[in-house]
């Protein structure tokens, strides 16, 4: 499984987050400021100043929500969660087809994530498009929902036709770089935990958990 979609933020967290972000009109600036030389040519959105206190405060909240979530930990095997920023796309804004930088000042980008802070009914257009080798995944998230996907994929955000698209984005440096190896480990972990919940502890399960842990040591970096 290369993608993970999950309801990360509850209604109260969303309400507080949106209320405080919408008060910061003077802190929203051009998104081109953090794009690479190639991506800046196709990036047309706004982002909250990353050095502002409110950006730092809520970036910490997002980081904590991700790192403490058991499902995300099993899927992404996060070593560091970095580059978190809040972005806004108003009418006619978009982010064209691009690839994320492999290395940033804050870490390597193995996985990218987007968290929707607005309901998908609040704006038209603005779909996140992720291109795999043989297909195109186009989606709009429910408010509070996160999608995590490999940073190796080309992706884009379609033009917002009306309304406002408010999201949080960031990157994960994983202990395991390989997409395939992360998928194998995730399946093994999920299967073992499922058997534990259904049948309880056993010597056979101990061996499976041992193999998972030792594979993680072998494949991790």
UniProtKB/Swiss-Prot annotation:
Binds 1 Fe(2+) ion per subunit. Keywords: Dioxygenase, Iron, Metal-binding, Oxidoreductase, Vitamin C. SMART domains: P4Hc. Its cofactor is Fe(2+); L-ascorbate. It is an enzyme of class 1 (oxidoreductase). Residues 80-174 form the Fe2OG dioxygenase domain. Pfam families: 2OG-FeII_Oxy_3. 2-oxoglutarate binds at residue 165. Fe cation binds at residues 98, 100, 155. Its EC number is 1.14.11.-. InterPro entries: Oxoglu/Fe-dep_dioxygenase_dom, PKHD_hydroxylase, Pro_4_hyd_alph, Pro_4_hyd_alph_FE2OG_OXY. One of its GO terms (molecular function) is iron ion binding. GO terms for biological process: DNA damage response; intracellular iron ion homeostasis. This is PKHD-type hydroxylase P9515_13321. It comes from Prochlorococcus marinus (strain MIT 9515). The lineage of its organism: Bacteria, Bacillati, Cyanobacteriota, Cyanophyceae, Synechococcales.
